[in-house]
Amino acid sequence: MADRSLPIVDAGAAARSESGCERTVQRLYQSRSQQMFGFARRLGLRDEEASDAVQETMLRLWRELDSGTEIADPDAWAFRTLYRLGIDSHRLARRLAGLVDRIGGGLSGATDRGHNDGDPARQIEVEAVWHAVDRLPERQRAVLYLRYRADLPYERIGLALGITPSAARGHASTGLATLRRRLHAEDDR
């Protein structure tokens, strides 16, 4: 009779992915989550952003360990990942503020605030801009999202949407002009 046994499974890999990864992540979370949260706050993240960044760091650590990546010092890896997430958050905030500035800062009477992310008036302004972006035609909306949320250059936007870089620039220009017109018209009411 032919041997019809189950496929051979690397017991070490199975243990590593099922319990080793889990133990490593749990141990790190239990011992360092408060310090990681504090570090994220010192990077300038608000409480809810800091909490999300710590959770994202733990998730990324779990994924890396589960994929078999050897991480010599999970503690240092986690803090480095958290630092990068904090930097990414600041970059996103600058891009979003850049969009508001691009279509004409000072909407709703808020002027010369720079990129103060904690300013409630600025946050309302950014939300108003993205709400207006949502009402643009599909192609313009996609280009503005990829440019200002994903920070892609026009060459990559063109590749992503199957258009030329100059067409992407054109859609961005038209979309920005439409946003300026709509938002300033609402402001005049």
Language-model features, listed with the residues they occupy:
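Arg/Lys-rich amphipathic alpha helix in sigma70-family domain 2
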Residues: 66, 80-109, 114, 122
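Structural recognition of an alpha-helix C-terminal capping motif at a helix-to-coil junction
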Residues: 52-59, 63, 72-84
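DNA-recognition helix of helix-turn-helix
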Residues: 83, 87, 155, 161-187
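A short, charge-rich alpha-helical start-of-domain segment used by transcription regulators
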Residues: 3, 14-38, 48-51, 62, ...
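Residue-level preference for hydrophobic side chains embedded in well-ordered alpha helices
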Residues: 28, 32, 36, 40, ...
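A short pre-motif secondary-structure segment
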Residues: 143-147
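C-terminal flanking helix
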Residues: 33, 37, 58, 137, ...
